[in-house]
Structure formats: structure tokens, C-alpha cells
């Protein structure tokens, strides 16, 4: 027989340890299993009565969410943003990549028209109406070329829900990782749990090349994060009614699922596809032959981009994507690698350019910040050497500005900062703090 302490009682109902199955101790208090169960019932009832959270703020992708209880505004055919207007907006934030911008602009415009036609067909006899099928998109480009930024910029102007997902976290059902239905869950959350709105949305799946199978031939072993994920995505890309767990499927296996029809959801996939150019060159039987002087001809990155534009479905199959998956993404656009001139433009021209961001930061401390043209080019040269595209720019500028950003809030005698090429090469702006009364001047050649 277990021994009970008759002095121990539940602090809520007053029952002794002998009268309950379990008594849980806390700092000076106790609670029995019956009270715990009662609290769970109360919380469940409260959660059922609470409407979805409404913030009216922008979500993680930068898209403004609709307020709870208010339907998202539907654009008429005359109000639809034209492809040229969409591209002009993308030009304000993303440098270059005109081909990819045109592909995305046309795809988004056609997506709007498909939704508009569906609404009109519901008002007439649907049997006589023409159905417009969606054309999912594949973006191919090196790291840091702007694939994700294009998607995030699109999210700012769209009147339909837009979600961004990462393919590297996905695994086949039953294994550690995320189910493919979690992609739809992100879109559902952006739509404020409005199923009808989510079914009109757009999903961008990043790093899609990371789910390529390890070899061209089908494997006899289980590839849970490669071919298995591609198989799971097939019906979702084409159009199916998917069961989406609103709290995530792995931790809450017994919850009620929400059904979402993906037939009208536009999918945009992006990836670097490192090594695809070698597969294409093997198809053409091309080898690097002859002698080329350094500096002559296009750069290696430019040659790679030119080769990728000749990619065919068979090349993607050899890379590791299954034919069924490729067939559901009929449109492909290639992004150009960024050269030094493009990196300079990224530093200075976009609305959210890095130089403008730091000028705003220092301006809040009443300090004027200027970059000499040679300094900007030196930053771009170093970023190009690191071969990580535009992502390298912020790291270089952060390292460069560390000393000034650290000392500046405590210095009232510093009112002007001029960044020179020498400072960029030294990766330090410490000398600015030594002589704040005079502007540093570049050494004469």
C-alpha cells in the first residue's frame, strides 16, 4: 500500500492526497489531477470562442495582413496591376534580372486574371466556361542573385496572400522535419485562417534544388528529404484538396484538419542548381578548349548563366528532379550572376540600398555619412570575390562600420564621416574617430 501524507491537500479543491490519483507539488502549493483536467477543459472552451488574431501589420514576408473579420479587397479586371507596372515596382528594389522580372510580372498578372475569371464563371453556367490552368514557375540563379528578394518584394504589392517556404526543412511524412502541408499552413496563417483567401494565394518555395535526389537512377533506399519530398509535392503543385493541420502535424497528431484546394494556388520555386551547367555541357559535348587570355571573353559566371538558359527537362532529370515534378513547373527563368557593376548599383540605387540604410542610421545621431566612389567599388570588388552575391555586401559594410557605430553615440564632436578606399581595404573606420574635426582625404596617386 502506498503511503499518503494526510496533511497534503490540493490548494484549489481542498482534497487530500488520499482522495485523488495524483497531487502535483509547486513552490508552497499543490494541485490535483482533477483540477488540472478541469483547467484544460476551461482553456479549450476559451480558445474556441477567441477569433483569429488580428494585427493589421505586415507578416514575415512583408505582406500586409487583413484585419480579422474584414474580407480582403478583390480587385476588378480594370484595377489589376499590369505586368509593366509590376516590373516597375520590382525595379525600385531589385537591380537587373529583367528576364526574371518579366516572367514573374506576367505570371502574377495572369494569376489575377484566372481568379477574376473564376469568380465570373461562378455567376454563369460553369459548363460552358473556359478554364485557365495555372503555370507554376522555376527560378534558377546563383546564390545572392535576388531570387528570394524578388519574392519578398512581390509580397508587398499583392492583393492575394503570399507565403515563403524553405524546401530544406521538408521531409517525407513520418520522419523528423516538416511535412509538405506546413507550406499551406504558412499561407493559411497569412490569410488569417481564411480558407477561401488562402486558395487564391501564391507560395514561393526557396532552395528547391536541395530536394533533388542523390542520383539520376531511382534509389532502392528511402530518400526522405529528396525524392520523397518531390513525390509529396506533386499533387499539391498540380491541384488537390490537402488536409492542413492548423497547429502543425507533428506535435498535434489528433487535431482536426482544414481542407484547402490547391488548384488555384500559384507556386514559384527557386534554387541555385549548382552543377546543372555541367549536365547541360555534357549534353552538348562541349569542353573548354583552346587558349583564352585572362580578361578576354565573358566571365565564368556569365558563361554559366548562358549555359543554364539552354536547360531542358532532361537536364533537370539528370540533376535529380523527377520527371513528374518537372512537368508541373512548365515555366523556367534564369537569373544572371551579379558582376561588380551590378553590386555597385545594389549598394547605392534601390530604395532600400545598404548605403542609404547606414546614412539613415547615422543621420539619427546627426552625423552625415558619405562613401567615395572608389570605396563603393572596393566593397563591390570584395563582395564579388567572396562569390556569395549581394549577401556579402552587408557583411562587408557591417565590418567596415563597426568602430564608428560603436563610438558614435558617445561622440558629439563627430558630425561627418567620409568612407575612403583605404578604410575599406583595412576593414576599419577607426581613423575617423582620431581626427573628427577634419574629413579624411584619400592619398594622391
Curated annotation (Swiss-Prot):
Residues in coiled coil: none
Q: Which gene encodes it?
A: clpX
A GO CC term attached to the entry: HslUV protease complex
Q: Give the record's family classification.
A: Belongs to the ClpX chaperone family.
What residues does ATP bind to?
Answer: 142-149
Designated name of the protein = ATP-dependent Clp protease ATP-binding subunit ClpX
The taxonomy runs:
Bacteria, Bacillati, Cyanobacteriota, Cyanophyceae, Synechococcales
For whether the record's keyword set contains Zinc, the answer is yes
Q: Is-annotated flag, keyword Chaperone?
A: yes
Domain ClpX-type ZB residue range list: 1-51
Quote the biased-composition stretches of kind Basic residues, using this chain's numbering.
64-74
Q: How does this polypeptide assemble, per the annotation?
A: Component of the ClpX-ClpP complex. Forms a hexameric ring that, in the presence of ATP, binds to fourteen ClpP subunits assembled into a disk-like structure with a central cavity, resembling the structure of eukaryotic proteasomes.
SMART domains from the xrefs? AAA (SM00382), ClpB_D2-small (SM01086), zf-C4_ClpX (SM00994)
For the region Disordered, what residue ranges are annotated? Answer: 50-77
Which controlled-vocabulary keywords does the entry list?
ATP-binding, Chaperone, Metal-binding, Nucleotide-binding, Zinc
InterPro entries from the xrefs?
A: AAA+_ATPase, ATP-dep_Clp_protease_ClpX, ATPase_AAA_core, Clp_ATPase_C, Clp_protease_ATP-bd_su_ClpX, ClpX_bact, P-loop_NTPase, Znf_CppX_C4
* Residues annotated as binding Zn(2+): 10, 13, 32, 35
Q: Which domain of life is it from?
A: Bacteria
Protein role: ATP-dependent specificity component of the Clp protease. It directs the protease to specific substrates. Can perform chaperone functions in the absence of ClpP.
* BP term (GO), one: cell division
Give GO terms: molecular function aspect only: ATP binding; ATP hydrolysis activity; ATP-dependent protein folding chaperone; protein dimerization activity; unfolded protein binding; zinc ion binding
Source organism per UniProt:
Synechocystis sp. (strain ATCC 27184 / PCC 6803 / Kazusa)
